[in-house]
Amino acid sequence: MKIRYLINVLFIVTGLKIVHGSEQSSWSTEIYENPYFTVGYDFRNGTVTGYMAALRTAPGETNECKLLFKGDRANKANISVKVVNATVGQSQSAMLSGQLEIRNNRFQLVVNKSQLPGDCDWVLPFVGYPAVEEKSGQVIVTVLPMISGVWRAVGVIQAKKAYFYQAPDEATVQKAYLVSGDILHIYDEKPGWYFVKFQGRKKEVLGWIRVRDTIQF
């Protein structure tokens, strides 16, 4: 059974190193970690985007808790963010609010457990201590990102198929494509286009993706 959830949540993320000027600094946990967490910082406009995925597995079944968030003014300690559901097959129609707090090298996510519909309230606790704790009616997710990078943003594919393009031009479509739910690291953008890298099982794929094929806030 897939999880149905919309999170009215307070996010506190501690650990995003912000670099001003011409340098870029973004962070991620290892892709196999549970929960997986990645954050992109765009120094040009101070925008932060991020993604979190937590899984609960059982024989023949995997339940997911995934979200995508975005905030502005990353040079400040507290950032208001918008949050959307990033779980495949579930609606992204509801826009929720949260907050990011930036300190040191630790990311912490605090969720009001009573506001988690569906099975998300038992997917997150399933991950267990020390990544997930429950205190005073809240689920607290803590991760330590070890991978730094230069991506400017994080995105998630919404279309059933999102083809790669050699250039930001419809005439340059390639055979390779991504599917709904795939996560992207965005390195550049043109009107209507993202230049992205996607880490596949065997190799990294890069190219241009149409913005309209991704989840938008």
Q: Where do the language-model regions lie?
A:
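SH3/SH3-like beta-barrel fold
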Residues: 181, 194-199
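Residue-level recognition of short, solvent-exposed, well-ordered loop/turn junctions
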Residues: 173, 179-182
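SH3-family beta-barrel domains
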Residues: 132-163, 177-179, 187-190, 209-217
